[in-house]
Amino acid sequence: MSLRSHEAAACAVIAIGVCGVLVGSLLVESMRNGQSSAKATVSTAQSTEEIQAQTEPTQMPAPTPEPEPVVQTVHFSATGDNLIHEGIYNQARARGSDGHYDFIPAYENLRDFYAGFDVNWLNQETLVNDDYEPSGYPMFSTPGDITNALYNVGFRVFSLSNNHSYDKGAGGIASSMAHWAAMPDDVVSMGFYNLETYDDYVYQTVNGVTIGYLSYTEMTNGLPTPSGSEYGVVYLDQRDVIEKQITDMRPNCDVLVVSCHWGVEGSHTVTDAQRETAQWLADQGADLILSLIHI
């Protein structure tokens, strides 16, 4: 209804503008006809006035001023990697009770820091679920209680695409996705995509700004996409898929955030391949590229 009202107003402005031009033309024609019929009796001074009336330009309506741009600001933080080794979940188990894990003390000192941002984004490096026993290096699985602590400290956006996404096979993917789907409505997660359509698009609106999120990885520790899984990651070399996803999402968001889990393990040096890929992503339409080094 609101859109239709705006459309009607826009049409009215256009109609008034057109009528103004047409009415002006008709008035000029009326003056010409009247002066022509009295031509034999008018004075020279009147003839001069007639000429001025005929040559005076038609007054056009003033153009509608352009609206002033509205500046909307979103304060954004990005953190990673949240990699939960055995020692961390064992400490949480010792603090917890009734079979639960208490991860809150591990993050509590960061609460004030993250409170200063409108959006807190996190690369969750390990699978999170309660269907698998917790495990650390090299094949990780993290108790679901960790999301209570992460939510408590202020994280609302979670990337799940990284080199440990396939650590527990198809079952791990399904369990982790189910866990994140059960989070509160203000939580968004991305990184596992339907392997047929790849159209699992995620948006978030903050302070009037719509943000779109995509997450990719360079590797999955040598593990192939699990057999029988409907969902999986998108690798950074799948450019046809990435190009389509960006093309689909770009018209629907003000800012498009793309995260990349990549690099040489143990190195902070940016490679030429990373630079080339980042430029390509920007050329496709990415506004912000989050680079997660593989260390």
Task: List the model feature ranges, each with a label.
Residues 10-34, 46-292:
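Acidic, metal/ion-coordinating pockets
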Residues 1-10:
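Short, low-complexity patches enriched in S/T/P/G
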